[in-house]
UniProtKB/Swiss-Prot annotation:
Signal peptide as annotated in the record: none
Name of the protein: UPF0235 protein Sbal_3028
Cellular component terms per the entry's GO annotation: cytoplasm
Family statement drawn from the similarity comment of this UniProt entry: Belongs to the UPF0235 family.
Organism lineage: Bacteria, Pseudomonadati, Pseudomonadota, Gammaproteobacteria, Alteromonadales
Superkingdom field: Bacteria
Native species: Shewanella baltica (strain OS155 / ATCC BAA-1091)
Pfam families assigned to the protein according to its UniProt record, in alphabetical order: DUF167
InterPro entries: DUF167, YggU-like_sf
């Protein structure tokens, strides 16, 4: 499976998370996953909450439209973004490569 997949208007992201980073950003590819750096530590679900907030802001959707499908407790996650309003250029480039 690729890092980014468009499925019935939703975006499926296979992510590798780097917690406790200096800033929030989509870094690029990490193997077959998209690497995302976030500032939150991986303690008591703070990283997941922060990741959901960051992705919601990035894709201009409510936090309730960000779903962690797999990897709740690990660095490797599969995320579903319901009907994203904006898709960042780094992700559209990856989608173009996999088409």
């Amino acid at each position: 499976m690729s890092a980014v997949t468009l499925q019935q208007g939703d975006l499926l992201l296979n992510l590798y998370i780097q917690p406790k980073a200096s800033r929030d950003q989509i870094v690029g590819l990490h193997g077959d996953e998209l690497k995302v750096a976030i500032t939150a530590p991986p303690i008591d679900g703070k990283a997941n909450a922060h990741l959901s907030k960051y992705l919601a802001k990035t894709f201009k959707v409510p936090k309730s439209d960000i779903h962690i499908m797999k990897g709740e407790l690990g660095r490797h996650k599969q995320i579903r973004v319901i009907d994203p309003k904006i898709i960042p250029s780094i992700i559209t480039e990856l989608m173009g490569q996999t088409s």
